[in-house]
Amino acid sequence: MISAVFERNDVGFVLRMYGHAEKEKPSGELVCAAASGIFYSLIGYLANECSGMKIRTLSPGNTVVECREDGEPAMKQACIGLIQLALTYPESIEVVSSAWGWSLTRSNNIRLD
């Protein structure tokens, strides 16, 4: 399973993304490709448009991205995209966001608290 955790820190925002979608499951390769696309789009945007981006690969399948406050819109977009993926394929990806207080509802909507 892929896990994506969005948090705030003293500088801005952090995304910790780790794990792998299981290829044995029918959705595994699709979820892996979709999550990777969202992740690499986020990194590309932050690298070109935002200040102070840091990326650390702790091990294969375990990466941390940090950015300052100006990266918040891109982080939100990535979080929403990954949440939509998790709503469709909950067996392959989970998303936790303490950064904005978002929660998932049973009607497949994202709610801001």
Predicted regions and their residues:
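Short, conserved glycine- and acidic-residue-centered signature motifs
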Residues: 31-35
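N-terminal intrinsically disordered, cationic/polar leader segments
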Residues: 1-30, 40-113
